[in-house]
């Protein structure tokens, strides 16, 4: 998403929010960290709209974690009310569902980053989002794995085909 489109979306939200004071914006899809400079500019723009229109934005960032680093995490902890970490369960399932271009799995790249992210938020205001598909009909095993290995808050999303 371009900065211009993002600003228009925030303007539309404010214009159509009526008397509602609290507004929610979730950066997700297409991996927002690939366009993180625009995300930051939109948060700054949203903060300026708060003052101008007496609104309060709650921003959420959803990420697959591949590009997550200390600088992004520090920013997210300051500006994002919630952080959603998208992982598809235990290593063999996640690697099957989310390989890199060369076929290598991504679990080992993101698992430690997600643990660090959860710890940096004091185990609060973050969520783990897994995906239930035909490849993991035993998704309860993935939930147990995530709960045991690093996470407290787990949400479910159904992928329809």
Q: What is the meaning of each model-derived region?
A:
Residues 3-26, 35-159:
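Radical SAM/AdoMet-radical enzyme domain recognition
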Residues 29-30:
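Short acidic donor-binding/metal-coordinating loop in glycosyltransferase active sites
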């Amino acid at each position: 998403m371009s900065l211009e489109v993002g600003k228009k979306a925030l303007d539309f939200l404010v214009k159509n929010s009526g008397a509602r004071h609290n507004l929610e914006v979730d950066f997700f899809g297409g991996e927002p960290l690939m366009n993180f400079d625009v995300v930051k500019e939109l948060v700054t723009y949203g903060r300026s709209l708060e003052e101008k229109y007496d609104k309060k934005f709650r921003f959420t960032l959803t990420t697959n974690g591949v590009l997550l680093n200390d600088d992004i995490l520090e920013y997210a902890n300051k500006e994002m009310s919630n952080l959603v970490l998208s992982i598809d369960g235990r290593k063999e399932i996640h690697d099957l569902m989310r390989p890199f271009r060369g076929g290598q799995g991504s679990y080992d790249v993101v698992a430690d980053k997600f643990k660090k992210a959860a710890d940096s938020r004091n185990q609060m205001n973050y969520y783990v989002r897994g995906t239930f598909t035909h490849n993991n009909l035993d998704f309860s095993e993935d939930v147990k794995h995530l709960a045991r290995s690093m996470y407290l808050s787990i949400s479910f999303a159904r992928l329809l085909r």
